[in-house]
């Protein structure tokens, strides 16, 4: 399917949306056991379909190489037996989580005789738009299903064959569990007009989740008429306080920057308290340099051999590479002010042994995730015990931080009286 007109795309998404709405009504009442069975069946089907998935991925790799995709994008696209096993394990992990649907979030009795319960319910239909990683097909579908939602998946054009092969395995799990095949649907075209149609499909899609780079997320946030769970950038900060433990600080700073530089939880800016620097010298900067990181330093830190003078634009920059901006600050208040000015609301970490300073850092910032003496690379749904995540949300409405199955629910009020009337 090529060169869709706007009306063609709207018709395609409307068809998928109507089927998804019908499936969502069934899923909303599906038992936890049935959803669990579907996820386990899908995990088994993915392993059984390994050869077919690898063949499909080889086609995608050839297509992507001809398109001239970067080595980093090709790596995200590539599947191998280990990555397929990890995908299946991810489905099993989500299956093992507690079912969020029907959970009583709060309950109280009123003097007027009413009993009121607030109970978790599915959102309905979720649209997921993502780029080259075919594993998102499995992760997003699993989390949506666990929370009783139908999902419409639109993967990257370069991963169409891989995603379709994974989707077939997911449908196998649905069928085995007696759930509607249309609970998990894929947009069957590479045409970008289909993405635009999803973003304006308020009648069929309850929330859009983009997974990808700044360009994709920015487009979705700008164009969507449907609510969006997303973060535009992961400009994560680490602040080494004057009361930081040196050994802990060295471990955390190095891990936060270098474990995986291309993820949204990678540290992009290191703030060092003047008193820490006076006591310990440029040890944190030197560790980064020794690890092959390009250190863009401001002021006194720029005198450290091997550093590069920082430009103002380096603070507030998401590098997604072995590059970090560093700066000296005079205490936690200056660190907070810097992060408020340059941060993206994703994840910040303070390194300190001082409880009061840590609490001030936590209260003074409103990022989705705030940490103490821990690497920002832990900003991940799996590490939070969610089984997996569909993304990280930095908005202030509904979901914040890692978006797992629980965050893909809403709630309703169940009110019980006894012939109760209002005077």
UniProtKB/Swiss-Prot annotation:
One Gene Ontology term of the molecular function aspect: glutamate-5-semialdehyde dehydrogenase activity
Domain of life, per lineage: Bacteria
Gene Ontology CC annotations of this record: cytoplasm
SUPFAM superfamilies referenced in this protein's UniProt entry, alphabetically: ALDH-like
InterPro entries to which the protein is assigned, alphabetical: Ald_DH/histidinol_DH, Ald_DH_C, Ald_DH_N, Aldehyde_DH_dom, G-glutamylP_reductase_CS, Glu-5-SA_DH, GPR_dom
Gene3D superfamilies: Aldehyde Dehydrogenase, Chain A, domain 1, Aldehyde Dehydrogenase, Chain A, domain 2
Alphabetical GO biological process terms: L-proline biosynthetic process
Pathway the protein acts in: Amino-acid biosynthesis; L-proline biosynthesis; L-glutamate 5-semialdehyde from L-glutamate: step 2/2
Subcellular location: Cytoplasm
EC number: 1.2.1.41
Sequence similarity: Belongs to the gamma-glutamyl phosphate reductase family.
Function statement: Catalyzes the NADPH-dependent reduction of L-glutamate 5-phosphate into L-glutamate 5-semialdehyde and phosphate. The product spontaneously undergoes cyclization to form 1-pyrroline-5-carboxylate.
Protein name, entry field: Gamma-glutamyl phosphate reductase
Species the sequence originates in: Paracoccus denitrificans (strain Pd 1222)
